[in-house]
Design a protein with these regions (language model features):
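Long, low-complexity, compositionally biased intrinsically disordered regions
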Residues: 1-143
């Protein structure tokens, strides 16, 4: 199990451009935050999208979520974007920080051969939104 802070730190190993992109090019809508009684966790959920990428305009919206699964701030993260699916989902699943929802469950041999448990820019944007909305502190612990 991993904390959100640890996952975001691991993401920095892929380069700082993810943090810059999350701040400037990722947009959010339909933000929801609250307990999920059947699963005994607190979930943050929103739709995210990138307004522009290197290849041009992208209009796809992605379902992005962060589940706080215990009082020690361990999380499960998820995003339906291709970067998360084919780079991070398997590695996070190996650490207990994600379920296999969107990928095929195979190891990302080319995109993430070291199996670094990081996240996409959409998850980083949702984490920033949690801090700005006062739901978590700067270390991503629930308030």
């Amino acid at each position: 199990m991993l904390t959100l802070k640890k996952i975001i730190r691991n993401t920095a190993r892929f380069g700082h451009e993810r943090f810059d992109l999350a701040g400037h090019q990722v947009r959010t809508s339909s933000f929801k935050f609250g307990p999920v009684k059947k699963e005994r966790l607190v979930r943050a959920l929103c739709k995210t999208w990138s307004e522009k990428t290197e290849a041009g305009w992208v209009r796809s919206k992605y379902a992005t979520s962060i589940d706080f699964i215990d009082p020690k701030s361990h999380v499960r993260v998820s995003c339906s974007c291709p970067d998360f699916c084919f780079r991070f989902e398997y590695a996070l699943h190996q650490q207990g920080a994600a379920n296999i929802h969107f990928s095929n469950g195979e190891s990302p041999g080319v995109r993430n051969p070291s199996l670094i448990a990081g996240c996409c820019k959409h998850v980083i944007k949702l984490a920033d939104l949690l801090v700005s909305q006062g739901k978590t502190d700067r270390n991503f612990n629930l308030l």
